[in-house]
Amino acid sequence: MENLNLALVSSPKPLLLGHSSSKNVFSGRKSFTFGTFRVSANSSSSHVTRAASKSHQNLKSVQGKVNAHDFASISSSNGQETTSVGVSPQLSPPPPSTVGSPLFWIGIGVGFSALFSVVASRVKKYAMQQAFKSMMGQMNTQNNPFDSGAFSSGPPFPFPMPSASGPATPAGFAGNQSQATSTRSASQSTVTVDIPATKVEAAAPAPDINVKEEVEVKNEPKKSAFVDVSPEETVQKNAFERFKDVDESSSFKEARAPAEASQNGTPFKQGFGDSPSSPSERKSALSVDALEKMMEDPTVQQMVYPYLPEEMRNPSTFKWMMQNPEYRQQLEAMLNNMGGGTEWDSRMMDTLKNFDLNSPDVKQQFDQIGLSPQEVISKIMANPDVAMAFQNPRVQAAIMDCSQNPMSIVKYQNDKEVMDVFNKISELFPGVSGPP
């Protein structure tokens, strides 16, 4: 007992001396470890075990609650992930009403590719025609000096003329010279009179021929003076050659128009002939001015120029060709023939009013398929089959319908042409929702 009282006195907490209760002792030593106890009673041991058991139970219950809470949080987070996956397709339809779905932009890209494919073919023909025309002009310029030199020297034509003028100068000389000239003129007259038989018989006697030749010599001295001057003769011949060149250029222009019509078929010829009436009946939303404005955008140039011929990759060349009235008229007729329905044209017009591929709204739409507008249009431009199939009005209407409501694809299950286009688009762009 004395040891116990000393232990109690040495404790940091103040306790009553001479009073020992098991409850107070153990309640005061809850903070110590069980290894420090040297004195223990039966009742206290049972109390300690119970407290330990309760503490273990409390720990287990707390751990169970923590585990349950963790499990609940994990399950709830998983539930949020699943719901977010299910909700994400439902969030895609609202943006198309404001900006346009990626499918609509794919349709615009297909339209661009179809347009520029036809433009490329036109430009190739135009470039070949210009090259051929320039080559013909060079050949004419090379032939003109040769022809003028030939006419100035006078190998073919001047031979008969000096024959008539030759006797005019030696008219007053001796008889030998007159006989030589008469024999020479006689030989030449037989050559000229050999064509009709009656004139040959009439010209058979020699004296008659001499008389006629003398009469002709007397009547033609004035002409010989004009014939002897070579510059006037060359000027006349050059004028004739120029007139010939004008006829050749006009005939080339006339022959070029039927060639273009035959290559493209009769429908294009009718459309080109009826150009004043066709725009009034049907006018495309994409005009030549809008096309020229879009081609001034550097991003559009980077997308389109690699697929155009080399003659059109220069912006100045493209602008020069767009200012050509003939080419501009043909391009307008082609755009009018490519125009789709009124709904498509109105929506495309609204989209192209503020045409900006770098706008954040457009980028947000293309993020759904994981591509940029440049990549979309470049992929379509690299596949001319899709571009040519887009010229079908039914395909345009189907893309317009499915861009607003992806479930409308069910209506086109039996249309092979439409489904082929959708299948090609889905192969090129797997992230596009709507078509299979």
Curated annotation (Swiss-Prot):
Composition bias (Polar residues) maps to 74-90
Query: Boundaries of each STI1 domain copy?
Result: 297-331, 373-412
What ranges does the record list as Low complexity composition bias?
A: 177-191
User: Where, if anywhere, are coiled coils annotated?
Assistant: none
Region of interest (Disordered), residue spans? 74-95, 160-191, 245-285
Q: Where is the composition biased (Basic and acidic residues)?
A: 245-257
Q: Which domain of life is it from?
A: Eukaryota
Q: What induces it?
A: Down-regulated by cold stress.
Which is a GO BP term held by this UniProt record?
A: protein import into chloroplast stroma
Q: Where is the transit peptide?
A: 1-39, 40-72
* The keyword Glycoprotein appears for this protein: no
Specify the signal sequence span.
none
Stromal side, ranges: 120-436
- One Pfam match, given by its short name, reads STI1-HOP_DP
Q: Does the keyword Transmembrane helix apply?
A: yes
Function, as annotated, reads: Involved in protein precursor import into chloroplasts. Part of the motor complex consisting of a co-chaperone (TIC40) and a chaperone (HSP93) associated with the import channel (TIC110). Causes the release of bound transit peptides from TIC110 and stimulates ATP hydrolysis by HSP93. Involved in reinsertion of proteins from the chloroplast stroma into the inner membrane.
Q: How does this chain assemble?
A: Part of the Tic complex. Interacts with HSP93, TIC110, TIC62 and TOC75.
Q: Let me see what the UniProt entry remarks about domains.
A: The STI1 2 domain (373-412) has a stimulatory effect on HSP93 ATP hydrolysis.
- Further remark: Inserts into the inner envelope membrane from the stroma after import from the cytoplasm. The transit peptide undergoes a two-step processing. The initial cleavage to generate the intermediate found in the stroma is mediated by the stromal processing peptidase (SPP) while the final processing step by a signal peptidase I-type (SPase I), possibly PLSP1, requires association with the inner membrane.
Name recorded for this polypeptide? Protein TIC 40, chloroplastic
Species this protein is from: Pisum sativum
